Design a protein with these regions (language model features):
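PP2C/PPM-type serine/threonine phosphatase catalytic domain
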Residues: 1-250
């Protein structure tokens, strides 16, 4: 069995309000973590991200289905629920949200996830980035096509142009989920984060700050300090949020 340690961070950055949300739930077998980044302004985006987190955790907790395809279906159901909460003539009329959901079965040592948008999941093993999700965005498509490099994504003027997010018509929603062997080893680390964080944090920085941190909270503090320093020239830099899970042998 795995022992898990979870820590969360959500900071409004240079904005007047926070459109990010994150949360987690656990049973005697599963840990479910969700992080979301809303869009639509105050009274819209902040509501959308909270709805995404609450719906995903609520649906999973009522009927745990720990595989990638089932999590993908939960995101699609949450999309319908989010659309149903729109209110014409208010900021909620056009609210959207990214979402990334991670489930760890700590008895079977298995991890599965699904996402829509550009909020990311990083899986680190032996102190190195082992895997990460691919964004549903214009710049990710350019990287995948060989037009630009991964390094060029950070700070790109069209970085926030998404190709999928909760709140769009169901037939247009693109959700990516895991398949195959996703066995967790003791010592593996998972990071869920919004673009307000990964915009300023490179893979080497993730690895270096992790190596220098003795606890999940210390790592989050180091990542937050990195973002704050790197974004100091932007008076209105984006909200940034992260949720981390450290694993070890129980």
């Amino acid at each position: 069995m795995l022992a898990l340690e979870v820590a969360l961070l959500s900071d409004r950055g240079g904005r007047n309000y926070n459109e990010d949300a994150c949360g987690h739930w656990h049973s005697d077998r599963h840990l479910c973590c969700v992080l979301a980044d809303g869009a639509g302004g105050h009274g819209g985006g902040d509501i959308a991200s909270k709805v995404a987190v609450q719906e995903l955790i609520g649906r999973f907790s009522r009927q745990p289905s720990p595989d990638g395809a089932a999590l993908g279906l939960l995101l699609r159901e949450t999309n319908v629920a989010l659309i149903a909460q729109r209110v014409p003539g208010t900021p909620r009329e056009d609210m959207h949200s990214t979402a990334v959901c991670l489930v760890i079965d700590f008895i079977a040592h298995a991890a599965h996830w699904a996402h829509a948008g550009d909020s990311r999941l990083y899986w680190l093993r032996d102190g190195r980035v082992h895997r990460r999700t691919r964004d549903h965005s214009l710049v990710q498509a350019l990287v995948d096509a060989g037009v630009m490099s991964e390094a060029d994504m950070q700070g790109h003027p069209q970085r926030s142009e998404l190709r999928s997010a909760l709140g769009i018509p169901p037939e247009q929603l693109v959700v990516t989920d895991t398949d195959g062997d996703d066995t967790v080893q003791p010592g593996d680390v998972f990071l869920l984060c919004t673009d307000g964080l990964w915009e300023y944090v490179t893979d080497p920085t993730l690895e270096q700050t992790l190596a220098a941190s003795s606890t999940p909270r210390a790592w989050l503090d180091a990542l937050a300090a990195t973002v704050t320093e790197a974004a100091s020239h932007k008076t209105s830099h984006d909200n940034f949020s992260a949720l981390v899970v450290w694993t070890r042998t129980a």
